[in-house]
Amino acid sequence: VLHYGQLDARLLLRVGGSMGDVYGQKVLKRDLNGYILNEEGVGLALENKETHLGSILPKMNMGWNLGFGYKGINLGMTFTGRFGGIVLSETQSVLNAAGVSKISADVRDAGGVPINQAKIDVRNYFQTIQTASVYYTYSATNVRLGELSLSYTLPKKWFANKLGMTVGLVGKNLWMIYCKAPFDPELTTSAASNFYQGFDAYMLPSTRNFGFNVKFQF
């Protein structure tokens, strides 16, 4: 059993299941008609109900490399994609409960969280569901421009045919084309276990990287 911070998610390996299956333990309490309970003087409440959230493992990883060359100029692009799987965000749950996230601001501006054809207090809602991982589970599917490189090989005649020289620029993680999670699904909280892949616990955002290179040929 592997726990995910303050969220109630647990990674469990069960008969008939698969490696990487994650289960949530609580959901908002509902009445017999399926409506979320919001009792006067009590407000919202959670109840125990184990829910299969999905697997942290992707169904497929893909990469696509493109290269173009013309008169010493070379352009290379690498697109990468991860399809399937889930990620969880403790960071988002804490920000929502504190009322400092964009989503909490949006629903506050809209007059409250819509539940049962009515709107309820934003603070009450987000503080109630703060530890319920079922509300902080996202698709891990993402597609990005992983690398872009541009290089130019200078004509050897510039160096009396005694030297070859190529200069280039390279950028990595430049463009997130598709991602529904509130953080980069490829980041990981812990290097000690691959099962923490895609668990966001106050991580720094991913960054773009730029580089310059020079290659000589004698």
Residue ranges and their predicted role:
Residues V1-I56, K172, M176-P182:
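Conserved small-residue
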Residues G72-G76, K157-W158:
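Repeated loop/turn-to-beta-strand initiation elements of outer-membrane beta-barrel proteins
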Residues G63-N65, E147-S151, G211-N213:
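Membrane-embedded beta-strand positions in outer-membrane beta-barrel channels/transporters
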Residues M77, V167-L169, V214:
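Membrane-embedded beta-strand positions of outer-membrane beta-barrel proteins
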Residues S206-F218:
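Outer-membrane beta-barrel "beta-signal"
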Residues G69, T80-R82, V170-L174, Q217:
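Outer-membrane beta-barrel pore domains and translocons
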Residues S18-D21, R82-K172:
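Extracytoplasmic gating/loop element in the C-terminal half of outer-membrane beta-barrel translocons
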Residues V1-D8, Q92-S101, K180-S193:
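Flexible, surface-exposed loop regions and adjacent strand-edge segments
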